[in-house]
Amino acid sequence: MKIENIKTLGELKKSGYESKSIKDELRSNLREKIKSGKPTFEGVHGFENTVIPELERAILSRHNINLLGLRGQAKTRLARKMIELLDEYIPFVSGSEINDDPLQPISRFAKDIIEIKGDETPISWLHRSDRFFEKLATPDVTVADLIGDVDPIKAANLKLSYADDRVIHFGMIPRANRCIFVINELPDLQARIQVALFNILQEGDIQIRGFKLRMPLDMQFVFTANPEDYTNRGSIVTPLKDRIGSQILTHYPETIKIARTITEQEAKLDMAQSDMVYVPSLARDLLEQISFEARESEYIDNKSGVSARLSITALENLLSTAERRALKSGEDKTTLRLSDFMGIIPAITGKVELVYEGEQEGAAAVAQHLLGDAIHTFFPAYFPKIEKLEKQDEKTPYTDIIDWFFAESGFELLDDCSDEEYERILGSIVPLEVLIKKYQPQLQKEDKFFMKEFILWGLVEYKKLSKDRFSEGYQFKDIYGSFISKL
């Protein structure tokens, strides 16, 4: 007999069901997962040796948890993943507002119904997906919202005195009894509201409007908070921090590989889009490097963080840029270009908080700086390093390319030009082909033209060529030609 088919308290007792607190439930199921070698927080990448072990220790210790980290560090995702460590179903007294355990009732409603009906008390089953409550801490949250208040309408309808505890309307926290309760952005919660959480965290009981209710709530609290006060927000009051068992610091992905895994998992790409646009591996790496550069940039306030959402939305915009270009050219398939990266600027500008120098430059200019920095960082990994100081007349691997620009006066690369035109223009620069054959002989055919454009952008970043943006595309010239044209 399936346990969730049990419908009365008597049947539940006969089945041998034993009550467990939610913290014991999480602990027990986590122990089984660790023993079996299964991943405990599947789909969360980059925390395997840092955050997840600390989170597992906190759960095994039955602690309430505070996840402390900058924006876009999977804090809420981790909290939501804890649902998977709960039992699939738990019983509760049918009609109970606070999910009363039939074997250990705490509300007056549940105690009264069990006293009247005994083993015939009807019970229902709560699935683990319904045992997750989340509240974003905003300045307008009140004690009544979280804990509860006296309900005058209820008192009038039931003809009850205000001295009767049945007039209480329970808030979110009592209604989340035997559940995981997450409060996001805890510092935004007013200090007086944080004080109201003291008793719940330490003793597990609540007080509503002077009613001395001894309700030992059974809850797993998870808080999320940002460590930096970069807005006009408050802070976590010290006695509340003292009552939170474990504080765990999250972080951004530490490698390009992990960042790529996260972006590819989270980006919402259309199947037709993915089939139409071929994305070279280097393009995906460059996209992730932009976030890494942003976190170190002098133009961006690193205290506010650069969310992993930047790369996710940038990838979506990047493919949409290439898709739009291909549709305008009447092409069924296309390969991503480096010039398509201009389409990701709107995804960057809204997700970085600029310092004074960045504001002076402008958000769009900062976004272009970040792309340039990413190319500058990656270039030496693919081609010989360009030295700042070179001897006069010394031949370098790039001399023939630079000479070609002196001879041909450069070219224009339009944003919406067809693949045929794009390949014709880059194919006309023969020294690019020679350089790739020498230093990237294993390069796939599909990646060749992206790599050619990458070389040109790299030479621009190392001040060997110049690149100017105009309304319809880019103009590449030798460094002196660009200087003369500006006179």
Show where each model-derived region lies.
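Amphipathic alpha-helical interaction surfaces
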Residues: 58-61, 84-88, 203, 293, ...
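Extended alpha-helical coiled-coil/bundle linker/stalk regions that scaffold oligomerization
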Residues: 335-423
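Short alpha-helical scaffolding segments that buttress acidic/His motifs in well-ordered protein cores
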Residues: 263, 287-291
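Conserved ASCE/P-loop NTPase catalytic core
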Residues: 2-257, 268-285, 298-303, 383-487
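C-terminal helical "lid" subdomain and adjoining coupling/linker elements of P-loop NTPases
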Residues: 273-280, 293-370
